[in-house]
Amino acid sequence: MVTRSSHTEDVIITTKNGRIRGINLPVFGGTVTAFLGIPYAQPPLGRLRFKKPQSLTKWSDIWNATKYANSCCQNIDQSFPGFHGSEMWNPNTDLSEDCLYLNVWIPTPKPKNATVMIWIYGGGFQTGTSSLQVYDGKFLTRVERVIVVSMNYRVGALGFLALPGNPEAPGNMGLFDQQLALQWVQKNIAAFGGNPKSVTLFGESAGAASVSLHLLSPRSHPLFTRAILQSGSSNAPWEVMSLHEARNRTLTLAKFVGCSTENETEIIKCLRNKDAQEILLNEVFVVPFDSLLSVNFGPTVDGDFLTDMPDTLLQLGQLKKTQILVGVNKDEGTAFLVYGAPGFSKDNTSIITRKEFQEGLKIFFPGVSEFGKESILFHYTDWVDEQRPENYREALDDVVGDYNFICPALEFTKKFSEWGNNAFFYYFEHRSSKLPWPEWMGVMHGYEIEFVFGLPLERRVNYTKAEEILSRSIMKRWANFAKYGNPNGTQNNSTRWPVFKSTEQKYLTLNTESPRIYTKLRAQQCRFWTLFFPKVLEMTGNIDEAEQEWKAGFHRWNNYMMAWKNHFNDYTSKKERCAGF
């Protein structure tokens, strides 16, 4: 039920936990009602730190859902102080462990049975919050008359620390947070005019990886209908870590903060008593090598949310049977290069040498054998025009983008479609006119989001007319997909987006010109990453060990030879002495 009191324009809705008050926002000559900061779980404080989220109890008053809630505790990116390009991703509300809240935007007048789109933010499972300006749901709600929902979930050690098998810190808490928010939507969205049987998950980067994990997690299956994955998938190399690795990282963190003991329960108890800030300061040191794309604490195969590695589940077809829409941006790698790859800077053109390219490979592929790195260098060298100055800069962008985002996303889509599900793939190639990063960084990771959420529609923000048209077309396709399982909807005037099949692999380009259809995106490079590179690792992964063993063996043999020689000399001198009698 909705009641309006005329003087304050507040909107009150009754949920299963109690009444909440929303706020009316003017959007493009109409109104959207927003409910910001609705609690969906008990605050994970004290003894609940590191545990799965617990359901909420009821409240008796009216909950004021008129402003964004706290963001979850996380480290802040301070690499480029005062620079909007990096700071736009930093939390814009207070940080707290009390952060399990969600937001709902509904059209007015209140719809009946509207399609729901649930956004899951990215940030490598280490950072992120639902209150960022680029995730504002009001434009999408107003233009497409869908209900938009977004939730905060725990990140970093507080969201993903794991001692596998121990209920005190089972791992994947951040994913269980998301799952509980999906349950909240199932129970409550009808009161907002939403249809619980028409729910599409969408997310970017680690958010898209999360969406694809919900596709692989049986408990999530009844909680949504369809899925959109922007620049991320669960089979990416940075995505899921083994139980062994997760456990080691927990023990390393415990050591750093002075919680090392034999007893696991004692370790967790000790970690619970530490200040959140101390955990944040130390969690960045748990990865033993200096890598630029490291997920310190992230999803694990816990046997509960995730029963096996994503690759295996995809192979076995253990996934939700539904439609997916997946895609990537043209320059997925550049965003990571300016955070420490040799020779790269946001303040110059970052023309790098072959040597710097090789140094870069060391940073992005720690632990990979020399032969492995050599094979990447060989595959990504432009042998036709070796002297072109931009070559190595573009090559490292491609290496990082192909390996971490583009090829895993294509592979996921291919496998998913092989199980008889309709899939649609896009390639986003428009560089926003508002992009604060330098020209050479191209169409960057994360910069399609503003077009999905309709930011270019706001006239006073100074996007170009062509960008407004592109944004409207993307919003229309995303909403069509959410409503009907097909981005084409009913209009015939725009380019039809073909279904992606594992044989032809057709995809659509998204840009300010007219969209085009191509086949087999980056086929050559992705064959390298999915087929050749794993073989190289398999064959050479233990070359270093073999070399060590050989050296040790040679050393032992050398010692035997020396000993034998000494014995022999000893023997001959004695023999000579005997012969002289």
Curated annotation (Swiss-Prot):
Q: Which GO terms describe its biological process?
A: acetylcholine catabolic process; choline metabolic process
A single MF term (Gene Ontology): acetylcholinesterase activity
Signal peptide interval:
1-8
Which residues does substrate bind? Answer: G123, G124
Catalyzed reaction equations: an acylcholine + H2O = a carboxylate + choline + H(+)
> Has keyword Ribonucleoprotein?
no
- InterPro entries from the xrefs? AB_hydrolase_fold, AChE-related_enzymes, AChE_tetra, CarbesteraseB, Carboxylesterase_B_AS, Carboxylesterase_B_CS, Cholinesterase
Source organism, top-level taxon: Eukaryota
Per UniProt, the keywords (alphabetical) are: Disulfide bond, Glycoprotein, Hydrolase, Phosphoprotein, Secreted, Serine esterase, Signal
User: What Enzyme Commission number(s) apply to this enzyme?
Assistant: 3.1.1.8
Pfam families registered for this protein in UniProt: AChE_tetra, COesterase
* Phosphoserine: modified positions: S205
Q: Does the entry annotate any disulfide bonds, and if so which pairs? A: C72-C99, C259-C270, C407-C526
Please give the residues the UniProt entry marks as glycosylated: N64, N113, N248, N263, N348, N462, N488, N492, N493
Where in or outside the cell? Secreted
Active site per the UniProt annotation: S205 (acyl-ester intermediate), E332 (charge relay system), H445 (charge relay system)
Q: Which family does it belong to?
A: Belongs to the type-B carboxylesterase/lipase family.
**PANTHER family registered for this protein in UniProt:** ACETYLCHOLINESTERASE, CHOLINESTERASE
Q: What does this protein do?
A: Esterase with broad substrate specificity. Contributes to the inactivation of the neurotransmitter acetylcholine. Can degrade neurotoxic organophosphate esters.
Oligomer and partners = Homotetramer; disulfide-linked. Dimer of dimers.
Name it: Cholinesterase
